[in-house]
């Protein structure tokens, strides 16, 4: 009131001087507020409120599930990564951030506690910390379930890259049939990074239908991985693949033999009853067909067979194949193989 009375008594010239003075006094405060905004991220506690802001701004949601008052890794990532200037600089203005806390020692508003329990169930959170990226339509883009030695800069860069890649894939999906095979392959690898299952499935179908070498290789590998190596479909894909490289110039026969051997060895370790000769049959077949022309891999294949026999306690067979490997190996690796030979001879 006193200030207003004084202002009323001022002349126009005096008012201009006073306005300048008041503005200059307020500048440091405004500047400090701007600096505070640029030095921190707003972490929303109310998920629905954050989701609404995400929809309005068409920005992705970055949700961190944490127990920051009792869980060591959560404390570490909060202090060293999420609060770091490098992380803030990279994600600020690009995400709507949500913090979902499961506290043990600090008080928490009951409706937020109940909300967080519901979110844990909704997103199937089994470990903390866990970070989920969601689109503004609440579609899950990516999930980080375990953290290693992330820094603020590399995590921030990764999150931005993931969102950008997801956007590229979303735009490419409707026009997938018009993409060249090289473009389709590039997008496929991008979809692998993001575990974009729908894109991967359709791209793989298109590539296999086009009889493309890369996609035939992928299809064969994936069928073997899910235990369908003996299926008619897998055998047809294998035949088409090998026919594309009859002379093994792309090492296709070697790769196929290795994949089949690894699958059979995995079955053996899982307790499937099969003779050792059945497990190594793909490698033996490769040696018989291409061993003489593929000297670079001959010794490697022989050592794989030797190692399998060792694991099966068949020392005599292991020794035979290790000796062949030694003879076929380049001089720089013979010393390593000779130590294995000494060990096998001693044990047998």
Curated annotation (Swiss-Prot):
Location of the protein in the cell: Periplasm
Gene3D superfamilies assigned: Glutaredoxin (3.40.30.10)
Signal as UniProt keyword: yes
A single Gene Ontology CC term: periplasmic space
Name recorded for this polypeptide: Thioredoxin-related protein DsbJ
Pfam family, any one: Thioredoxin_7
Lineage: Bacteria, Pseudomonadati, Chlamydiota, Chlamydiia, Chlamydiales
Domain of life: Bacteria
Protein encoded by which gene: dsbJ
Keywords: Periplasm, Signal
Keyword match tRNA-binding: no
Stored InterPro entries: AGR/TXD (IPR051099), Thioredoxin-like_sf (IPR036249)
Signal peptide feature range: 1-32
């Amino acid at each position: 009131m006193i200030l207003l009375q004084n202002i009323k008594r001022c002349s126009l010239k005096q008012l201009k001087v006073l306005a300048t003075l008041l503005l200059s006094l307020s500048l440091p405060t405004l500047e400090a507020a701007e600096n505070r905004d640029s030095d921190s991220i707003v972490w929303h506690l109310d998920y629905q409120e954050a989701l609404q802001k995400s929809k309005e701004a068409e920005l992705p949601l970055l949700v961190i599930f944490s127990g920051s008052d009792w869980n060591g890794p959560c404390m570490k990532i909060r202090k060293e990564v999420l609060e770091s200037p490098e992380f803030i600089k990279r994600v600020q203005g690009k995400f709507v951030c949500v913090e979902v806390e499961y506290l043990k020692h600090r008080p928490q508003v009951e409706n937020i506690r109940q909300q967080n329990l519901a979110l844990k169930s909704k997103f199937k959170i089994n470990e903390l910390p866990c970070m989920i990226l969601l689109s503004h339509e609440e579609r899950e883009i990516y999930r980080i379930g375990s953290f290693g030695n992330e820094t603020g800069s590399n995590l921030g860069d990764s999150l931005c890259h993931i969102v950008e890649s997801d956007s590229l894939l979303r735009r490419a999906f409707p026009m997938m049939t018009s993409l060249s095979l090289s473009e389709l392959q590039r997008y496929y690898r991008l979809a692998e990074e993001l575990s974009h299952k729908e894109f991967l499935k359709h791209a793989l179908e298109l590539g296999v239908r086009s009889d493309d070498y890369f996609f035939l290789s992928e299809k064969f590998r994936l069928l073997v991985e899910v235990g369908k190596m003996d299926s008619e479909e897998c055998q047809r894909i294998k035949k088409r693949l090998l026919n594309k490289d009859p002379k093994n110039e792309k090492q296709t026969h070697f790769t196929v033999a290795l994949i089949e051997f690894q699958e059979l060895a995995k079955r053996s370790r899982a307790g499937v009853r099969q003779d050792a000769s059945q497990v190594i049959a793909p490698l033996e077949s490769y040696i018989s067909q291409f061993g003489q022309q593929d000297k670079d891999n001959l010794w490697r294949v022989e050592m794989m067979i030797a190692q399998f026999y060792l694991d099966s306690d068949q020392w005599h067979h292991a020794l035979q194949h290790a000796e062949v490997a030694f003879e076929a190996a380049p001089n720089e690796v013979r010393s390593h193989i000779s130590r294995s030979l000494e060990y096998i001879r001693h044990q047998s």
